[in-house]
Amino acid sequence: MNKTLSLLLTTTALVSTPLMADTNKQEMVNQIQAQVSSWIDIQVTPQSSIIQKMVFNCEFYSATPYIKSPDGSESSSGSYRFYAHNGVLGSMTEPFTTQPLPELTMCLKEDFVVTNQDEAQLLFEAIETVYPNHSMFDENFPKEIIEKTNGWHFIDGEIFDDKKGYVVESTPEGKVTKIIRSLNL
């Protein structure tokens, strides 16, 4: 009987020790996650302007995560853009290369058309409020608006001797069907 009790206690001790160690590890992981999470701050800024209200039927936001180090310093790894359309929140495409910007096209007011230079200028300026060009290389670059057979080119800078900007495709009536960020205009 003593041997059985001794064997039972030994087996219980051997089986429960790793479980307690795993529980302690998970508790430490949870504590570390909670501490690091307390270092993160997210600043959300509404991006609103009169020109946006004239062109788009969405609200735009910028979210910037900041990491506060234990020594008190802060760092950020960039901002992210969001839109709200009919009560639905979505994230904006971040154009790092030539690519369509479907959220901008979707957010255009239903009756907005581009049929002349002034309306093209209005759209170009509205796009720049959503996607500001912060490149120091383009600060003094003269912006251009060029009418094409199926839309417009909005040029806002250069990259390796190629012009960059936006391609706006539209119907003959001026209804915008697609907005593309382009690095080779």
Set out the residue ranges of the language-model regions.
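A short, surface-exposed interaction/processing loop segment used at functional sites
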Residues: 78-110, 162-185
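Sec-dependent signal peptide recognition
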Residues: 2-8
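Exposed beta-strand-loop-beta-strand "reactive/processing" segments of non-cytosolic proteins
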Residues: 34-86, 139-169
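Hydrophobic helical h-region of N-terminal Sec-dependent signal peptides
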Residues: 9-14
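Short, non-transmembrane alpha-helical segments in secretory-pathway proteins
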Residues: 22-57, 67, 93-146
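N-terminal signal peptide c-region/cleavage motif recognized by signal peptidases
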Residues: 16-18
